[in-house]
């Protein structure tokens, strides 16, 4: 699968703008603002399928962490390194299509950014929808690049949809 087509979701560049406007009312120090901007740019690039920008914003030693049902082909715990992450993303997007993405809150403190919201997805294997579920993200930034993408979600409902048990 071509890298540019790996992620076809509703997480478009507007995601970054939405979060930025929510956080705009808060005062941030320069490091926090830079970290926030980096994570929002990364999310926007991911949602828009802009692999060049994603690659530029990823540290070579970036870790993507996602726990859950190990029978799901994209759940591996820690995925380490840019190359491994680019191999993982097409597996994820070919199995789960995001159908809804709403951000609730986001904040940044130093090198850490947290994002909280609600999403829904459809498992391509079964066609079953997860319905709405919550997510949280903890990301870390170093020297203008994302070094940690720690994803939290309702992995039970995702597993149920994937295995046709909804």
Write out the residue ranges for each language-model feature.
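Short, low-complexity N-terminal intrinsically disordered segments enriched in polar/charged residues
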Residues: 2-56, 60, 166
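Short, mixed-charge, low-aromatic patches
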Residues: 40-49, 72-76, 92-96, 116-118
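A solvent-exposed, acidic/Ser-Thr-rich amphipathic alpha-helical stretch
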Residues: 34, 53, 60-105, 110
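A beta-strand edge to alpha-helix "cap/lid" segment located at domain peripheries
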Residues: 8-19, 24-26, 30, 86-166
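Short, charged low-complexity linear motifs
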Residues: 49-52, 74, 134-137
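A generic signature of intrinsically disordered, low-complexity regions enriched in glycine/proline
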Residues: 6, 71-73, 158
């Amino acid at each position: 699968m071509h890298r540019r087509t790996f992620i076809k979701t509703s997480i478009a560049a507007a995601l970054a703008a939405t979060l930025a406007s929510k956080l705009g009312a808060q005062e941030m120090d320069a490091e926090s603002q830079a970290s926030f901007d980096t994570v929002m740019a990364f999310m926007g690039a991911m949602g828009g399928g802009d692999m060049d920008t994603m690659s530029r914003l990823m540290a070579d030693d970036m870790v993507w962490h996602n726990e859950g049902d190990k029978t799901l082909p994209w759940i591996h715990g820690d995925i380490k390194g840019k190359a491994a992450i680019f191999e993982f993303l097409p597996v994820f997007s070919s199995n789960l299509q995001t159908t809804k993405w709403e951000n609730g809150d986001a904040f940044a403190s130093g090198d850490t950014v947290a994002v909280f919201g609600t999403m829904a997805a459809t498992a391509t294997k079964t066609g079953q929808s997860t319905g709405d579920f919550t997510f949280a993200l903890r990301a870390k930034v170093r020297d203008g690049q994302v070094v940690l993408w720690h994803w939290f979600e309702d992995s039970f409902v995702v597993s149920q949809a994937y295995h046709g048990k909804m």
